[in-house]
Amino acid sequence: VIPVWILDEVVEGHGACPKWRLGLAVSHFADVLADKGSRLTLRRGKAVEVLCGLVRETGAGAVYWTRLYDPESVERDTAVKAALKGDGIEARSFAGHVLFEPWTVETKTGGFYKVYTPFWKSLKDSAVPAALPAPTTLRAPDTWPDSDRIEDWDMGAAMQRGAEIVLPFVNVGEAAAQGRLGAFIGEGISGYEAARDRPAANGTSKLSENLTHGEISARTCWHAGMRALHEGKQGAETFLKELVWREFGYHLVYHTPVITTGNWREEWDAFPWNTEDTPQVTAWKQGRTGVEFVDAAMREMYVTGHMHNRARMIVASYLTKHLLSHWKIGQQWFADCLIDWDAASNALGWQWSAGSGPDATPYFRVFNPLTQLDKFDRDRAYVDRWIAEGRARPHRDALAYFQAVPRAWGLSPQDRYPEPVVDVAEGRQRALSAYENR
């Protein structure tokens, strides 16, 4: 068996933080294989050309891989399979990234699901196969093919000085992911339903980065959640619902791939969203809108590569509604800054917030970041952790933000905290007027 990983055209297009985090995952996986007496062969180039070349070099008779469902990956995998089969090579892909293949889940009329709740109800009692255990050893070939060095790829180049800031918040590898899952099921899941909406609480599983990079299987998480449910642990069903929300994203991106690039609801194509990097958009990206909940969330993402889910909803609503800026601006910024970036989940989340997606929040639901702060961060622990300006003794994580951002931004913790770029009440009314007149 010759394990191979290819830095191909799809991965080359990843944003700074996801690409860097993927490099960590690949490097760690290479170490795991080495411990099993194997090697990870690294190549760079177009997947179909690299694989066909490796087959010729090694005399391999079969190529196997795990399926993905975003449009670019589907196109790539289709081309690879056709080329290999054309050369008489067995080419097979397998389902390992999701609980159910998107085409196996159908409505009663044979279509695909467009609303989450019936999608959840159709799956919650379905049998999910258990994840296969990792092999203890892999039979090595007589001769190993040449391999690139991952250090030469410099997958973290675009991170600049931010990499050393984000690194302590990363949890790399299967063993670490399994440990995180075990701790969550054993200690955290009972309080999950209540704590998951409070960004200052350590109330979520934090498994999203590991799921994204294949370091733990959704099936493994599902079976752990089901065991917790059968043991009567409060919060277990909510955890399972979140896994199915991830599944819903893949279901939609497969059946309607436009969701990653354009409005899922075509009637939103004429909506007058701003599409430029205006000063207000720049303030949003930099966490300097003058709205503490929004700014804390954006800074959390820049320092840790994570953002709490409640905070994601608030910053997305603020950008698309209070600032009337296109959701694709936010989608692209998240794609550059998140270590758990996932094309399907990212697109679904942004279009849900903007109102342009399937099962989206109604246009008149405009999150008020001030009342959200009172509700979910009443003691201000979250904003105090991430905002340094005006604090006599700023939290170290708030100060880390100024060490992580590009020097060209010219930011300092001694700066005055900015005034709001838009009045919250006026921004809400402007959004409602625009939606009602669209």
Regions found by a protein language model. Name each.
Residues V1-A131, G235, S345, S433-R438:
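Trp/Phe/Arg-rich N-terminal binding region typifying the photolyase-homology
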Residues I6-D8, G45, L68-D70, G96-H97, ...:
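An acidic- and aromatic-residue-enriched active-site/binding cleft used to recognize and process polar
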Residues I89, G110-W268, F376-D377, A381-R438:
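Glycine/tryptophan-enriched, flexible segments
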Residues N202-A392:
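Active-site-proximal binding-pocket segments
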